[in-house]
Amino acid sequence: MNEFFSVEPNYYLVLAAVLFTIGAAGVLVRRNAIVLFMCVELMLNAANLTLVTFSRINGDLNGQIMAFFVMVVAAAEVVVGLAIIMAIYRTRRSASVDDANLLKY
């Protein structure tokens, strides 16, 4: 019964590649800072999925531990990034990344 529910690791790697591609396309195309952060998070989740998949293939926990640390760093990145976005929005009334260079004035 367990073999019926098991999924090949190749499918996880393909899913991770698709998620990373969607995130990279969003980073390249979009100008809204909040959408950029969401796309970067999507790319980090794709990297985490790849780490966990290779951890499962090799049978060790190192990839899962690394994915955990990536999630912790990503959470800290979101906190700092959203604080910067809020500062930009308060001064410029826009969340566009084009206004980010105006924050120094």
Curated annotation (Swiss-Prot):
GO terms for molecular function: NADH:ubiquinone reductase (non-electrogenic) activity; quinone binding. Keywords: Cell membrane, Membrane, NAD, Quinone, Translocase, Transmembrane, Transmembrane helix, Transport. It catalyses: a quinone + NADH + 5 H(+)(in) = a quinol + NAD(+) + 4 H(+)(out). InterPro entries: NADH_UbQ_OxRdtase_chain4L/K (IPR001133), NUOK/Mnh_C1-like (IPR039428). The keyword Transferase does not apply. It is found in: Cell membrane. It is an enzyme of class 7 (translocase). NDH-1 is composed of 14 different subunits. Subunits NuoA, H, J, K, L, M, N constitute the membrane sector of the complex. NDH-1 shuttles electrons from NADH, via FMN and iron-sulfur (Fe-S) centers, to quinones in the respiratory chain. The immediate electron acceptor for the enzyme in this species is believed to be a menaquinone. Couples the redox reaction to proton translocation (for every two electrons transferred, four hydrogen ions are translocated across the cytoplasmic membrane), and thus conserves the redox energy in a proton gradient. This is NADH-quinone oxidoreductase subunit K. The gene is nuoK.
